C-alpha cells in the first residue's frame, strides 16, 4: 500500500468502486435532477435523484421487476429491450411527478456506445424526459426491439435444439417463443404507453 506525506487515502466509496467523486461533483454542479441508471447481470434500475445536503433524495424510481409484475414482460430483464422499456417507464413516472428534465448519471459504468445503459436513456427521452445526449450513443432500433435476440434464437434452434432450450429455457417456461421477442416487446411497450397516457387523460 502507498504511504508517505503526500499520500491521501481515497474516500471509502471510491475505494469500494461505488462512486467517482469528480464525476459526481460535475453532475451536482448542473443543478438538475440526475437520471441514475445502474445495471446488474439480470436487472436494470433507474431513479430520478436530487441532491440534498442531508442525503440524496429519490423522487421516482423504476426496476425491471416492475415490467414483469405490472406489464407482463416475459423476456430477460438484463437485455437491451428490457432496458429501453425501463427507460420508458421511468420517463413517464418522471413526467407524472412534474419532472421535465434531468442529466444522466451512469456512475462507474463505462460509457459504451450502444450499451443497455443508453437504451434506458433512449426510453426515458421517448417518454418525454429532456436529457442532454448525443443520438450516436443509442443502440440501433433492431437491438432495442430484440430482433438480434430473435435471430440468434432462430439460428440456434436450427443448429442445436437442445442448446436452444437450455439457453432460452427462461423464455420458454414463461410461454414466450424467443423468436417472437420483437412482437412481445411492442406489446409491452404499448401497455406502458397506454397506462400513463390514459392516466394523463383522466387528470
Curated annotation (Swiss-Prot):
GO biological process: ribosomal large subunit assembly; translation
UniProtKB keywords: Ribonucleoprotein, Ribosomal protein, RNA-binding, rRNA-binding
Segments forming a coiled coil: none
Keyword 4Fe-4S: no
MF terms (GO), sorted A to Z: 5S rRNA binding; structural constituent of ribosome
GO cellular component: cytosolic large ribosomal subunit
Family: Belongs to the universal ribosomal protein uL18 family.
Subunit and interaction comment: Part of the 50S ribosomal subunit. Contacts the 5S and 23S rRNAs.
Function comment: This is one of the proteins that bind and probably mediate the attachment of the 5S RNA into the large ribosomal subunit, where it forms part of the central protuberance.
Name listed for the protein in its UniProt record: Large ribosomal subunit protein uL18
Species this chain originates from: Pyrococcus horikoshii (strain ATCC 700860 / DSM 12428 / JCM 9974 / NBRC 100139 / OT-3)
Encoding gene (name): rpl18
